[in-house]
């Protein structure tokens, strides 16, 4: 092993791969008449890791032991609390999709169609997390796109083929991998057309985007500029076939429950009819009765609805579910903050009353699980700011008063309890 030396009289040694001298790198490792530096070793390790990951993707999609729907659901349970029916629907749909891909090369009279998925549920109910967890489980390229940023090609904004470009970027422009990936399109409800009737005027960010997405979701050859460039005439494009990409579309669909209720209550007219009041059923129960005609009335075009045959509805998370989300998943928020405080060699205790207060506040804000982190972050801000410069703190206790803003965290200094911010 050749270490760097400061002597001018010594003959300089150079890396045989990058040509850097021993003074430009941390270490030079000697072989028979050759040297390699630490930087080149790191680069080689990175190349090996990338190739191993690529081999893992191919193996995960071609192996005979594709996870069963029950195994997929069990893994979803580790990260997503509640939404049992949605997890079961997703597990079956994803299993069937990748089982279909495994049998593409086999000649058969029956051609299996792709089953893209539509997730309907309020903000913070777990739609995006479900899609992310599925992609991580299957070890396939994954991208999240925001439908509200999309416009028709030729207008200011992103066109739909930018989605495929991002998917390619996520797998280092390996087309075969991208063609078996998962695309999650969020806020799909925000591009609904403004009325039930087809638009007479140009709607470049609503119905126009739906028409553009239709081709992508159904399966087309998307032309993507190489290495993330902009489209220019006479430019070579990367051709990506979207036929086998799984598309998952999600949205809150605020107001859809009213459309469903209006439809279902039409039957309750006349003598002896039993009409349920709208308050008797919660929104989640109503959304489970979603029919294609309701989505058309809401503003999605029939052709796009037809390309999203699997519909899973997610209910609003109640206080008990939000409290479980804080502590039970593998990457639960409370576990994350325990780890952060442990890095300062301090124990963090968040009492059950505090967890309940966090859940209540998230429900009041109508942010669902997505708002939990900001509530905890706000409550712990002062103590996380002061803690690195404090001496002798062994434990921090958070109760419901801290969450509600009526108190401060209790700090344990060896044997003496003190309140954060007190002298």
Curated annotation (Swiss-Prot):
Keywords attached to this entry: ATP-binding, Chaperone, Metal-binding, Nucleotide-binding, Zinc
PROSITE patterns noted in UniProt: CLPX_ZB
Entry-linked InterPro entries: AAA+_ATPase (IPR003593), ATP-dep_Clp_protease_ClpX (IPR050052), ATPase_AAA_core (IPR003959), Clp_ATPase_C (IPR019489), Clp_protease_ATP-bd_su_ClpX (IPR004487), ClpX_bact (IPR046425), P-loop_NTPase (IPR027417), Znf_CppX_C4 (IPR010603)
A UniProt-annotated Pfam family: AAA_2
Keyword field contains Nucleotide-binding: yes
GO cellular component: HslUV protease complex
Chain ranges of the ClpX-type ZB domain: 3-56
Record keyword Iron-sulfur present: no
UniProt record, GO biological process: cell division; proteolysis involved in protein catabolic process
Function: ATP-dependent specificity component of the Clp protease. It directs the protease to specific substrates. Can perform chaperone functions in the absence of ClpP.
Family: Belongs to the ClpX chaperone family.
Protein name per Swiss-Prot or TrEMBL: ATP-dependent Clp protease ATP-binding subunit ClpX
Source organism per UniProt: Burkholderia cenocepacia (strain HI2424)
């Amino acid at each position: 092993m050749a270490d760097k030396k400061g002597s001018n009289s010594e003959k300089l040694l150079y890396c045989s791969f990058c040509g850097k001298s021993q003074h430009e790198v941390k270490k030079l490792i000697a072989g028979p008449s050759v040297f390699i530096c630490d930087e080149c070793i790191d680069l080689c390790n990175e190349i090996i890791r990338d190739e191993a990951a690529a081999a893992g993707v191919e193996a995960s999609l071609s192996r005979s032991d594709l996870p069963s729907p029950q195994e997929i659901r069990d893994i979803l349970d580790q990260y997503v609390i509640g939404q049992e029916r949605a997890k079961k629907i997703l597990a079956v749909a994803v299993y069937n999709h990748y089982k279909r891909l495994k049998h593409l090369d086999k000649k058969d009279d029956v051609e299996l169609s792709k089953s893209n998925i539509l997730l309907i549920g309020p903000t913070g109910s777990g739609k995006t997390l479900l899609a992310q967890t599925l992609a991580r489980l299957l070890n396939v390229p994954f991208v999240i796109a925001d439908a509200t940023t999309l416009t028709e090609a030729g207008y200011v904004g992103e066109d739909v083929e930018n989605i495929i470009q991002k998917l390619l970027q996520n797998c280092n422009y390996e087309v075969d991998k991208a063609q078996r990936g998962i695309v999650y399109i969020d806020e799909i409800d925000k591009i609904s057309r403004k009325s039930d009737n087809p638009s007479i005027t140009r709607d470049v960010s609503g119905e126009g985007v739906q028409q553009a997405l239709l081709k992508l979701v159904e399966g087309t050859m998307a032309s993507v500029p190489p290495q993330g460039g902009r489209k220019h005439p006479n430019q070579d494009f990367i051709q990506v076939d979207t036929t086998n990409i799984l598309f998952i579309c999600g949205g809150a669909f605020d107001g859809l429950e009213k459309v469903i209720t209006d439809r279902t209550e039409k039957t309750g007219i006349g003598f002896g009819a039993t009409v349920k009041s709208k308050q008797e059923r919660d929104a989640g129960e109503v959304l489970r009765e979603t029919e294609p005609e309701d989505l058309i009335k809401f503003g999605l075009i029939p052709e796009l609805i037809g390309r999203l045959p699997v519909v899973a509805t997610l209910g609003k998370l109640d206080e008990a579910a939000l409290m479980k989300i804080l502590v039970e998943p593998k990457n639960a928020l409370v576990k994350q903050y325990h780890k952060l405080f442990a890095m300062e060699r301090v124990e963090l205790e968040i009492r059950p009353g505090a967890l309940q207060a966090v859940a209540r506040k998230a429900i009041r804000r109508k942010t669902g699980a997505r708002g939990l982190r900001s509530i905890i972050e706000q409550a712990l801000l002062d103590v996380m700011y002061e803690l690195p410069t404090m001496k002798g703190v062994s434990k921090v206790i958070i109760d419901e008063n801290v969450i509600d803003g009526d108190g401060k965290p209790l700090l344990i200094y060896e044997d003496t309890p003190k309140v954060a911010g007190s002298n």
